[in-house]
């Protein structure tokens, strides 16, 4: 899901002008997110995967972030509340920082530069947990798997509204 491209020095800025801020960057803030979502019908999961909106959130982390936020991945961006936006900002940073500390997620073949597997997959709340019980206390929902933008999407059918 990546690519390698060689740029002339002057072409580099054109490329980065079309890439959104990283979620750990201060530019990924409440005002930025709010302004991006105004009148947008696209679902929130698609936005989190859109590198023009925010760079660096992949499919696994988008599902996990939305679970922590208690947001249904099919919810349209224009219907996202200010509280939802605060949660998206907060939990994007939280999930990604946890994943970094755990060395990433090794599902099949991911290894770090020293050849070690990541360990964040042991922390998954929804990703690859289809038909299992939700891990939130007092939630009796089941984890569902559906597809958004041809990507597997995992969510709790009860606590993600």
What are these regions (language model features)?
Residues 1-161:
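Structured catalytic/nucleic-acid-binding cores of DNA maintenance enzymes
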């Amino acid at each position: 899901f990546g690519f390698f491209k060689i740029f002339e020095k002057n072409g580099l800025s054109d490329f980065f002008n079309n890439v959104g801020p990283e979620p750990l960057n201060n530019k990924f803030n409440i005002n930025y997110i709010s302004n991006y979502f105004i009148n947008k019908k696209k679902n929130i999961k698609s936005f989190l995967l859109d590198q023009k909106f925010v760079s660096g959130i992949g499919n696994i982390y988008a599902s996990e972030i939305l679970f922590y936020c208690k947001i249904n991945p099919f919810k349209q961006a224009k219907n996202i509340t200010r509280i939802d936006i605060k949660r998206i900002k907060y939990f994007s940073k939280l999930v990604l920082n946890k994943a970094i500390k755990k060395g990433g997620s090794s599902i099949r073949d991911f290894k770090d530069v020293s050849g070690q597997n990541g360990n964040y997959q042991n922390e998954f709340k929804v990703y690859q947990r289809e038909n299992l019980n939700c891990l939130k206390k007092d939630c009796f929902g089941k984890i569902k798997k559906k597809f958004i933008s041809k990507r597997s999407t995992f969510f709790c059918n009860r606590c993600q509204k």
